[in-house]
Amino acid sequence: MARKDQISHRGPLSGNNRSHALNATKRKFNLNLQQITLKTASGKKIRLKVSAKTKKTLRKWGHV
């Protein structure tokens, strides 16, 4: 499975590492993916990989 949030569909970002001499080398900023379990309206459990930011938003709105 790709490193994507299954709810918000956000993926990794790209940027640069910067050394002390300010040399730039490409790097990837991965999401902080975590596995959560949600209950559907019918009571069925589903497991999703979501970012920590999405998990925090779901918790705020009472879905987790």
Curated annotation (Swiss-Prot):
GO CC, alphabetical: ribonucleoprotein complex; ribosome
Per the record, which residues fall in region Disordered? Answer: 1-23
Q: Which InterPro entries match?
A: Bacterial_rp_bL28, Ribosomal_bL28, Ribosomal_bL28/bL31-like_sf, Ribosomal_bL28_bact-type, Ribosomal_bL28_sf
User: Which residue ranges does UniProt annotate as crossing the membrane?
Assistant: none
Q: Name one GO biological process term.
A: translation
Disulfide bond entries:
none
Annotated protein name in UniProt? Large ribosomal subunit protein bL28
